[in-house]
Amino acid sequence: MRVIESENELRLTCSRSASGGIALLRCETQDDIVRLPDEIDGVPVTEVGAYVLSERVPDLTGKDTFAVRITCGGTEPKHNAAAIRTVTLPKDAKSVGSYAFYNCRNLERIELTDSVSEFGGGALMNCMSLREVILHAAPSAPTCLPRLLGEYAGELDVRFDEHARLLFPEYVEELEDLSPAHIFQRRIHGAGYSYRQCFDGGALNFRQYDAALSELLERHDFSVAARVAVRRLAVPFVLSDAAKADYLAVLRTHGGNLAQSCAKAGETAALTFLLSLGVLSAADVDAACTSAREAEQTAALSVLLSAAGKTQSKGRAKSFEL
């Protein structure tokens, strides 16, 4: 068995792909932070197979495989899909197989590059903890993001490196049985489905994405609208003046609740940015201070008290600086 020193304890089952790269067919690990290898013996990993990290073992009968041990000096792992919290895919991976992360119930983050063009059905089934996708790609370029979002109906925070940050809200899809004919009618609840349609040929259409804010407001999903707004304003990639004004208006009306949530969670960077926009009233800041005190978030409280002091300073405008 080939043994490679790295930062993880992994047991890999691999094969040669038709393109000449390496197909990673199975990865067994107990690690919470998993970085799949970019290459093995100088050959790039180009395929991530079906059920590769899932709870279920893939059927590899009849395949010509070889084993690779990735180690940082520990013992050989016994696979535990529930232990996995973050996964970084190989930088040259072109495809992710069906059910790749099936039943990885505690998976919170996936990191991948724009080389991935295929994202298999069921790849994120039962990944109920997934919250973040980091995509190393240009925000305006075609990527696998539409396929990935199509596999996950929950709320997702998506980052294109440092170039753009977006929130895709959740939605719920259900089939209603129209008895006695037993005709099933598809019903979709939540604005997240509309946000997932904002793509042209695999590339995100930012104009459509920003226009989808109106549906959130019509649905009175104000807390979600505030979270969408603060992300777009923080990293304003191709943000029009009109869309910027709409997002600022949302935060003037509903930013107070967001500030309280950030204060309770101790998210000082988010609080500092929100304060810098000048959208919070004195009452909003006071309420956030109360939330920080109750949660014993002293750093967040310090940020808020400093801002409250600035708003009360004689002759100072009600705005905040980073």
List the model feature ranges, each with a label.
Residues 2-22, 28-46, 57-95, 105-118, ...:
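Structural signature of tandem-repeat unit edges
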Residues 262-266, 293-296:
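Hydrophobic/aromatic side-chain positions at a characteristic register within alpha-helices
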